[in-house]
Swiss-Prot record:
Record organism: Synechococcus sp. (strain JA-3-3Ab) (Cyanobacteria bacterium Yellowstone A-Prime)
GO molecular function, one term: ATP binding
Subcellular location: Cytoplasm
EC number: 6.1.1.7
Record-linked InterPro entries: aa-tRNA-synth_II, aa-tRNA-synth_II/BPL/LPL, Ala-tRNA-lgiase_IIc, Ala-tRNA-ligase_IIc_anticod-bd, Ala-tRNA-synth_IIc_core, Ala-tRNA-synth_IIc_N, Ala-tRNA_ligase, Ala_tRNA_ligase_euk/bac
The name this protein goes by in its record: Alanine--tRNA ligase
Superkingdom of the source species: Bacteria
Amino acid sequence: MSPSFSGAAIRQAFLDFYAQRGHQVLPSASLVPEDPTVLLTIAGMLPFKPIFLGHQDPQYPRVTTAQKCVRTNDIENVGRTARHHTFFEMLGNFSFGDYFKKEAITWAWELVTEVFGLPPERLVVSVFREDEEAFALWRDAIGIPPHRIRRMGEEDNFWAAGPTGPCGPCSEIYYDFKPELGDEQIDLGDDSRFLEIYNLVFMELNRDSEGRLTPLARQNIDTGLGLERLAQVLQGVPNNYETDLIFPIVQKAAEIARVDYFQASPEQKVSLKVIGDHARAVMHLIADGVIPSNVDRGYVLRRLIRRMVRHGRLLGIGEPFTLPVVETAIQLAEAAYPEVREREAVIKAELQREEEQFLKTLERGERLLFDLFANVTASGAPKQISGADAFKLFDTYGFPLELTQEIAQERGFSVDVQGFEQEMEKQRQRARAAHQTLDVTAQGSLDELAEFLIETEFLGYSQSSARGVVEALLVEGKSVPQVEAGQSVQVVLDRTPFYAESGGQIGDRGYLAGDGVLVRVEDVQKRGDLFVHFGWVERGILRVGDPVQAQIDLACRRRAQAHHTATHLLQAALKKVVDPSISQAGSLVAFDRLRFDFTLSRPLTPEELQQVEDLVNTWIAEAHPAQVSIMPLAEAKARGAIAMFGEKYGAEVRVVDFPGVSMELCGGTHVSNTAEIGLFKIISESGVAAGIRRIEAVAGPAVLEYLNERDSVVRELSAQFKAKPQEIPERVAALQAELKAAQRALEEARSQLALLQAERLLPQAVAVGNLQILAAELGSTPPEALKTAAEHLLHKLGEGAVVLGSVPEAGKVSLVAAFSPAVQKLGLKAGSFIGEIAKLTGGGGGGRPNLAQAGGKQPEKLAQALQVAQERLQAELSSGLGS
């Protein structure tokens, strides 16, 4: 292997190339991004996202970087394919409103062909199907033959960093590992032949949460060249793991496992590659400040470490082994990323602690598993570990399913994987149903603290501010003596005015202020008798025992109060207008809206919804005062107070009463008079389950915000239609009628065009005895018109068979077969025949013996499929006629 093509040399050559073309070389950003919408830095462009969005001015018009990235969305493929990784380096050049497509394409080609010496004849490029400018540049400016420029759809060649944010069409350079197959078989989806090495994104659009695309303030360039991928090509190795960037780590793991990598079994190689990959990710994550935990990026790190340990066990390594492996990773990375050596002690300490802890988990899990083996054997039942037991091992003891399966197999047992997945889905449903804010470790820590901490005194019914003392601080689920600026923290006070989430009402927001310290509180949760304030330290140092002034955000509290009281009024109105037997099935009381689920087997009519809304607003206008009292549960029920079905209440309950309107058992906060709500507006009514309906609504200031948003939409529609607001429904109806008429006319025109085109296909028919065969492609003809054309052709041909195919839209194939009675008598059925042909295009279908339709999703294989159809028809009809 030439030293000039080492991983380090590739990285430096890339940066030097663009530095010579006016780019500022910037160091890699941290794997912990400033962007709150993503856990980790997943792409080279992520540090520049604010610039691409126009939220921040660039310091330099052109930059180039070698960016550390971590992605875990395909973690199960790591080690099993040649190119999947969790950690990788993305080399990139970026332009912020400076150069655009021409320069990006020209320089990319110059770099890969002249600097790295890749033969042009082994390169293929792709462009977005609608990007004519990029296609012309590759063809005319670079000189690539058109057949080696592939037009691709949005799924392949329209790039985005995520569901929202900067995006745009892209163009990719692929390396051809098998040029001897020729240009006739260029399929960029064939990973064994083609490897994408360079992606050029022409970043000119922004996609919002509604999926709308709008132009960015500047036309930008964002490129990405995978260092590991290019190293594989230049170093002539079969996969990324055998490049000099990773292979020394793999070899170290093999040495510890006493395995010869080149003589290892396929599964052993997978484990060695997983260890080599994860070691790099773990090293860089800890170096960038991530520590193992059960939440967010800390959980990603913990999972990677545990996968390393598990794959070590699969290799037969029974003792801790990760430190020498990561030391090799540090040696490889320290020249480019000095921080990994500077934080070596932290990296190894966190890794050692996590590995030792997980090994204990594995030992404990194995003991429990062996007990299960013994119990099942003694019972005489089939040798299978139930899904519930496998899930308990996983969920309670962190014992991986794969390890349970491996050990079970060694003992002649199977594992009910389907049952395990069912238990996993149940847990996901529980997680979705419950607002989880504490991780498992944090819950355990609080349980321990609760043994000696006093119950938090809640003052929030009468006070918005109160003096309290810090009883406990938790970071990442662990009790700590102090926290500093920039840290997320959970604070337990001896007394607080903050309402903790319960009864559907979300927790208060606000702040805790002390001597030189300020903690912003974003949520409050109740754990037993303790109120836990979730937030982050904006400035100063907060210590256990410090006195603080706890102040709620009054504006948020008032919004929550308005929505909570409105929820009570809504339930009362539903009982009065719709059905007295209606009962609450769930609720959400937030700052910006309310949601009320209730029992009813049918949708509400528009008239009922309006009556309910009007009645609530009437009660608001009547200014009913609130009366709150504490009384025995039996007395409250005797007075007619509404209790939520299934809720557990103590001997004494809090009753919120708006006399003559509503009386409920409730621990939430409310307005002192219904007039404080102002207005109430129902937004929607829908079904959420059998017998359960849901109303979403807004109250108080949120009504004005909702109406302003609606008004903005109406004004925009008025401008678009050049009509008064009251005229919009009529204009929309007219437009819909015009659209339907145009669609009918278009379909008719397409059918006529298809028939004209079909007529031209008649000379292509082939005679087999007295039968005529025709298999042909009919452009972009829609399915219905294609069927009409097939019937028309069969009528013209007389006795025979017609198979037609088309590509009605990108990524879709339409097929139809029409067989005459004479063909059917020979045993050929249109339905089964076209179904088999459709499989060749990645689809399926069928229908009647005389006429059938099918579809596919691989247009590039349509011509081949039609050729197969022609050959099969000729062969089978010849055979039938001959017999």
